[in-house]
Amino acid sequence: MNTFTTTAYNTLGEAQETETQTDSWTATEICLDFSMLYGYAETLDAWGRHAGEYGDRPAALGQRAY
């Protein structure tokens, strides 16, 4: 079973909230909700691979390497 961890960040790049799901679609919906609340959110799978993001990535987080 795969897990998806979504982390929300404020405009300073500070993590505000994290949630883990086993369903990729639920993780996508949570990512969108978090981005609306905090400005940016990204979802990673159990191996740390990028699975999605919404919002404007804060400069403090640096450039994402895919």
Pin down the residues of each PLM region:
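Secondary-structure transition/turn motif
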Residues: Y9-N10, Q21, E53-R57
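A short, charged, amphipathic alpha-helix used as a generic interaction element across diverse proteins
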Residues: L12, T22-W47
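Short, mixed-charge low-complexity intrinsically disordered segments
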Residues: M36-Y66
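Surface-exposed loop/edge segments in extracytoplasmic proteins
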Residues: G13-E19, H50-A51
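Short aromatic-glycine-(Arg/Gly/Cys) micro-motifs in beta-strand/loop hairpins
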Residues: M1-A15
